[in-house]
């Protein structure tokens, strides 16, 4: 493959911006960019001349990004095979701006070797220049906006990355931001919270949104597309991101196209600093690349048993979900968990959590009524080696009982929609008011609630007059507020109401909630919680940025990151690194299977939601355990201590959970057995033969009567693979992966010898990526450390570098 010439943007008309660009052109002379090749040899691309018809190639792992002379992406090439993965007939600039509410596209692009910078420029109409610094990393490349130059009077509102139109959609990891087939994977990852991994609701026409399949996995909980880098389309897939400028007051559209006023934030909230990573990879190396990106770019990197949570078996571990967990019974609950081989107790407490109210998240009496009381509960469970988790409702602010955020006087930082002034005075007893604008009462926000000063007022009818809007059917003094008179001209704001009919915290409150959730981990010792209802942080108008601010802010407030499980109601690209898993419940097993297809596509652990075992037969409980073994999926076993303490079958239930979960976590079931367990028409029972080592698996009918002969289930003897690693080529990107035959592996370590200089070994995934600098034979020993009582595995490998 050869590089076509690259334009230097010559021939633009004279002007201030043109002179700036020409001054910069002196350090943009011809430069060789190396497109990292396959093991058979590196491919090099050279800028040969400066014509407008040129093409620039930029390596990003095994992906070669081809830009034409205008800065449009015209090639997405697997540099190993030469195959172009761009969707035929589709291309957009890598970077575009929205200036003065008009889409502005570059007319040229230039590379500067002095600072590794791509300059996207346009001197016609809305003149601008965007500098993007490109850095080659280990298997990926980063792209960061370092400068935006335009007319000082212009309003740079949004920066758009792509979308990159990809021709394949065999597997689309929406939240992970990865599109792949059996041969190649292409990924885009936002590298900070301000770079939102999604597409702005305001510009569907610029991002092929009409072609997007909103819910390709048929998730019942919701479509994940509004918060996702990757989206499946009718012709392939797109990878996209954007950054909104919040240095000025903005309006952002919610899911119902309602405009929500936001900001302004500080001067750092411009589009400068928007940053993404791009990469192409063999499919089996994607988790290794994502691990290197997270660790190399200072993204959240939670671990389970010291292993990155995205590849840790412990991320999919089961728990006991006990509706009546409290300080009096936690000791017995922990002993039950021990008997079942379960490490986590979880308090859902009416699907809200053990709180006096949501918002400030102070513990209620079930957890001792204070942080100190809750800490004692946690310590009691810890004596049995069991950790405690709690349910939260993210930035839902409860109004019954009222949280201090809504108690008079209500916090001014509650999330609000549009505003308009009173056009007439309002008395404290009136059931009608008049507005000088329509925005506060237009459709598009849950419920019909207004805020005037510190009073919350609901309404049920709106009628347009000649110069004002009549709002009637008022119910005064809602949410514990006090009816009050208000003068003409007083602002009236629409209140953004959550799906539980309470308030939602705005950005300042979101930050405080994140700090509070950090405290319950650091001080109290809580090690597991769910961000239920987290879409509310997006409904504030802040979109993915709002969700990331809460979830990643909570992570930042933690003083330790090992062994903490976080679940979510929405899996988003910007919070993917922090979140351990989703665990969506449903009574329909087909839906749970579909959920797990989504989890697998996004490198998330298998989960089967909460499963209420109260009063169920042992056969029905084992049937769900069999499905969990088939999918390698954890389960939230929901019940009450009242039931477990009174039921005669409790010891048998606990033992069955222990046997199935132990065998699952060791990888004891064969692929053939897992396929049989997946069949929803079947029921099974599992009995221990040698504790922790072997079991007898028996198919049964609905009454528990055996069908056919029993099968042997055995813990695997740990082994490493493959037997031989591929040959490497000096100066060319190399990728390989050491694997084990058990999910119980928690660490890969080079215990003797060493890799070729330039290669990096990932201890969490077993992946090897890099560009070897020297020829020769390099021999080393890899040791896999295993959990669950399994022996460690060792193998000696040699990499030949030619």
What do the PLM-derived regions correspond to, one by one?
Residues 757-773, 781:
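Strand-loop-strand motifs at the edges of beta-sheets in extracellular beta-sandwich domains
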Residues 308-309, 313-417, 496-518, 524-541, ...:
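Aromatic-lined carbohydrate-binding/catalytic grooves of carbohydrate-active enzymes
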Residues 789-802:
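C-terminal edge beta-strand
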Residues 743-750:
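Solvent-exposed loop segments of extracellular immunoglobulin-like
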Residues 394-483:
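Autoprocessing Asn-cyclization modules and mimics
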Residues 57-349, 380, 387-388, 527-528, ...:
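Carbohydrate-recognition beta-sandwich/jelly-roll modules
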Residues 547-715:
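Active-site-proximal substrate-binding groove within the catalytic cores of carbohydrate-active enzymes
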């Amino acid at each position: 493959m050869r590089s076509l010439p690259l334009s230097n943007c010559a021939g633009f008309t004279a002007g201030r911006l043109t002179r700036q660009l020409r001054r910069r052109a002196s350090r943009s002379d011809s430069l060789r960019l190396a497109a990292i090749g396959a093991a058979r040899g590196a491919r090099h691309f050279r800028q040969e001349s400066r014509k407008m018809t040129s093409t620039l190639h930029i390596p990003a792992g095994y992906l070669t990004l081809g830009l034409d002379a205008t800065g449009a992406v015209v090639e997405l090439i697997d540099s190993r095979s030469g195959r172009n993965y761009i969707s035929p007939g589709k291309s957009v600039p890598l970077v575009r701006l929205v200036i003065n509410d008009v889409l502005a596209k570059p007319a040229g692009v230039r590379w500067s070797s002095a600072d590794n910078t791509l300059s996207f420029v346009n001197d016609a109409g809305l003149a601008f220049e965007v500098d993007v610094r490109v850095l080659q990393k280990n298997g990926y490349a980063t792209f960061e906006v370092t400068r935006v130059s335009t007319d000082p009077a212009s309003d740079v509102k949004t920066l758009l990355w792509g979308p990159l139109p990809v021709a394949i959609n065999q597997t689309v990891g929406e939240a992970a931001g990865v599109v792949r087939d059996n041969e190649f994977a292409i990924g885009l990852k936002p590298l900070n919270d301000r770079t939102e991994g999604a597409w702005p609701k305001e510009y569907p026409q610029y991002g092929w949104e009409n072609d997007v399949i909103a819910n390709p996995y048929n998730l019942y909980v919701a479509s994940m597309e509004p918060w996702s880098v990757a989206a499946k389309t009718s012709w392939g897939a797109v990878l996209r991101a954007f950054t909104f400028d919040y240095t000025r007051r903005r309006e952002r559209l919610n899911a119902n196209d309602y405009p929500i006023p936001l900001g302004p934030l500080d001067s750092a909230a411009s589009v400068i600093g928007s940053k993404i990573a791009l990469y192409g990879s063999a499919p089996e190396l994607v988790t290794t690349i994502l691990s290197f990106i997270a660790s190399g770019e200072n993204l959240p990197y939670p671990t389970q048993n010291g292993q990155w949570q995205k590849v840790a078996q412990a991320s999919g571990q089961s728990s006991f979900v006990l509706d009546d967990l409290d300080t009096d019974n936690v000791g017995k609950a922990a002993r039950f968990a021990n008997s079942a081989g379960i490490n986590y107790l979880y308090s859902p407490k009416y699907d809200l959590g053990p709180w006096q109210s949501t918002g400030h998240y102070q513990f209620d009496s079930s957890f001792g009524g204070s942080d100190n009381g809750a800490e004692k509960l946690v310590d009691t469970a810890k004596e049995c080696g069991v950790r405690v988790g709690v349910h939260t409702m993210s930035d839902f602010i409860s109004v019954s009982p009222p949280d201090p955020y809504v108690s008079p006087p209500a916090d001014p930082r509650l999330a609000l929609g549009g505003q308009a002034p009173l056009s007439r005075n309002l008395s404290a007893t009136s059931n009608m008011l008049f507005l000088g604008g329509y925005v506060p009462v237009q459709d598009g926000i849950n419920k019909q609630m207004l805020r005037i000063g510190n009073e919350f007022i609901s309404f049920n009818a709106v009628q347009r007059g000649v110069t004002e809007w009549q709002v009637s059917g008022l119910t005064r003094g809602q949410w514990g507020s006090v009816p009050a008179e208000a003068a003409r001209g007083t602002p009236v704001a629409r209140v953004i109401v959550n799906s539980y009919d309470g308030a939602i915290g705005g950005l300042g409150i979101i930050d405080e909630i994140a700090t509070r959730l950090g405290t319950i981990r650091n001080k109290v010792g809580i090690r597991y919680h769910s961000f239920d209802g987290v879409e509310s942080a997006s409904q504030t108008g802040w979109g993915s940025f709002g969700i990331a601010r809460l979830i990643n802010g909570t992570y930042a407030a933690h003083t330790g990151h090992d062994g903490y499980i976080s679940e979510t109601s929405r899996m988003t690209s910007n919070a993917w690194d922090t979140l351990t898993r989703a665990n969506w419940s449903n009574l329909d097993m087909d839906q749970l299977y579909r959920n797990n297809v989504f989890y697998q596509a996004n490198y998330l652990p298998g989960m089967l939601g909460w499963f209420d075992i109260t009063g169920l037969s042992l056969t029905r409980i084992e049937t769900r355990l069999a499905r969990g073994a088939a999918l390698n999926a954890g389960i939230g076993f929901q019940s009450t201590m009242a039931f477990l303490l009174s039921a005669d079958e409790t010891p048998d239930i606990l033992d069955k959970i222990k046997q199935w979960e132990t065998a699952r976590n060791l990888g004891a079931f064969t692929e053939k057995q897992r396929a049989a367990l997946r069949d929803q028409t079947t029921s099974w029972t599992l009995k221990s033969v040698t504790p922790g080592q072997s079991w007898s698996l028996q198919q049964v009918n609905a009454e528990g009567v055996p069908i056919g002969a029993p099968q042997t289930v055995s813990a695997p003897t740990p082994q490493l693979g493959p037997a031989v690693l591929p040959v490497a080529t000096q100066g060319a990107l190399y990728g390989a992966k050491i694997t084990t035959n058990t999910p119980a592996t928690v660490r890969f370590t080079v215990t003797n010898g060493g890799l070729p200089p330039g290669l990096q070994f990932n201890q969490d995934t077993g992946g090897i990526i890099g560009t070897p600098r020297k020829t020769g034979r390099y021999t080393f020993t890899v040791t896999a450390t295993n959990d669950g009582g399994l022996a460690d595995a060792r193998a000696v490998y040699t990499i030949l570098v030619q």
